[in-house]
Amino acid sequence: MSQSGKNGLTYSDAGVDIDAGNLLVEKIKPAVRSTRRPGGDGEIGGFGGLFDLKAAAFTDPVLVAANDGVGTKLKIAIDADYHDTVGIDLVAMCVNDLVVQGAEPLFFLDYFATGKLDPDQGAAIVGGIAARCREAGCALIGGETAEMPGMYSSGDYDLAGFAVGAAERGKLLPSGDIAEGDVILGLASSGVHSNGFSLVRKIVELSGLDWSAAAPFAERRLLGEALLEPTRIYVKPLLKAIRETGAIKALAHITGGGFPENIPRVLPKHLAAEIDLDAVKVPPVFSWLAKTGGVESREMLRTFNCGVGMIAVVAAENVAAVSEALEAEGETVITLGRMIVRDEGAAGTVYKGTLAI
């Protein structure tokens, strides 16, 4: 007989706490309301989230959708018991993928799965999601919280995000006029962002440090906290530069695969990106990872952003205007390389210089 009473088993006996789920919804409602924007001003709790595209003031929009997760960076958050920033990563990974196509993020939905729901932990995660939805200008219109005992170990959870944006027809990126001699600008990252954390965790294991140790690469910070530095969101600076200058031909979000996997995705087949590694300002975290793990430069470049979280392709005569527009919004911009003719069978990304790790 169930311990819950003489009437047999309950859902709670099976490990699912409906009351905890309801409590979480109440806890996150103020954060969700704070993300309202034109077109997205409904309440959570319905069977589906609503968005009024007409109210967003587009004339002839094309919708752009993206979804992503945070990967094994979550394992550090779980082990370090620090959950406030992973929601930021979740939003960033999705909305940065929208803006590279010239799209303005409109709305966001999240999926939070766990073995046992902790409403306070869930509220911390959703609070991070809501904060960065505000930063990106998109409404958090819904989501799913799944308590799944037996699917996840105690304390473990996973996150997925889904974002939809829009661009006016004819304004999507990349444009069709990328040419030899165009300049590649690099926008600084905030750290490791949300890729390569299986390797990061392996290196930390080899180092013998734990998450509460002092970070060897960051003064007055704990290792776990420093590695959880959230992914930078580039949306508003890039949208402003796109609209003010009309000069950005392509953007690439430097995520898993680094330069060699991500930059060629936005280039025509006859062109390659020549990257000047001497221009890359490598943050200390990457130098520590490379030295501690004995990771070669080529492997670093195909695993991590190495200090450049986004690139933009512009004509040489527009470098100053685009750089100034981005810097006015707080971005750190470097001249990273240029477009060259790609020989048949050659790689889409080639390097000169040396990565300073």
Curated annotation (Swiss-Prot):
InterPro entries: PurM-like_C_dom, PurM-like_C_sf, PurM-like_N, PurM-like_N_sf, PurM_cligase. One of its GO terms (molecular function) is phosphoribosylamine-glycine ligase activity. It catalyses: 2-formamido-N(1)-(5-O-phospho-beta-D-ribosyl)acetamidine + ATP = 5-amino-1-(5-phospho-beta-D-ribosyl)imidazole + ADP + phosphate + H(+). Pathway: Purine metabolism; IMP biosynthesis via de novo pathway; 5-amino-1-(5-phospho-D-ribosyl)imidazole from N(2)-formyl-N(1)-(5-phospho-D-ribosyl)glycinamide: step 2/2. Gene3D superfamilies: PurM-like C-terminal domain, PurM-like, N-terminal domain. It is found in: Cytoplasm. GO terms for cellular component: cytosol. Its EC number is 6.3.3.1. One of its GO terms (biological process) is adenine biosynthetic process. Keywords: ATP-binding, Cytoplasm, Ligase, Nucleotide-binding, Purine biosynthesis. The keyword ATP-binding applies. Pfam families: AIRS, AIRS_C. HAMAP family: AIRS (MF_00741). Belongs to the AIR synthase family. This is Phosphoribosylformylglycinamidine cyclo-ligase. The gene is purM.
